[in-house]
Amino acid sequence: MSATKFVKPASVHSRILVPGRYHRQPVISRLVSRYDLTVNIKAASLTLDSESDGWFDLELSGNPQKLTNSLSYLQGLGVNLVQLAIANQIQATDNSLAFPDSAYKLSPKDSAWLTDRWQEQFQQWMSLGQTNRLRLQLCVLKTYYEQPVISKLVSRYGLTVNITSAILQPDSQDDGWFDLDLWGRTKQLYSSLSYLEKLGLPIWLDLSSVYGDR
């Protein structure tokens, strides 16, 4: 009987440019669910304007073959792999395409709607007949810069996560702000919010979608 061969996980650092037409598709979420990767977002710049490209610096880790397949998937979508580093060795790069220093900033809601209010909002969301889609704004504190917070929403709770807008400067200069569209069962959504609360990350539920975009 042969022993199962252990495959050492690999790590890839990639800067990607996502075309505007894919802003409403959970591209990064699929890297986790489809290829079983851990994805840490190291920097992000994405606006709600579908005409603008989205920029992400990603740290991808997982099975080497699945990593290769995931990069092929991105290229198949027309995602530009601006910079790619494997084991800290630059494989392909275009230094003329530096990460944008965007003046765009998300507007956090009033501090009264911090993490201690999400359960009340969640109950309101359920009372209006919502069961599988939830929008929220998430602040990823700079102390969590090295942790794949959004990736775990997919791998641990089985959610589909679409990032609709984001701003996270490189090198943990500031907190990161993300507008997220979460899809999943009610229990999964509730558990994921509890997880974010335990981390101490500020979250605001966006109930406007309940009324205006069912």
Put a short name on every predicted segment.
Residues 2-177, 181-214:
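Long, contiguous binding/interaction regions
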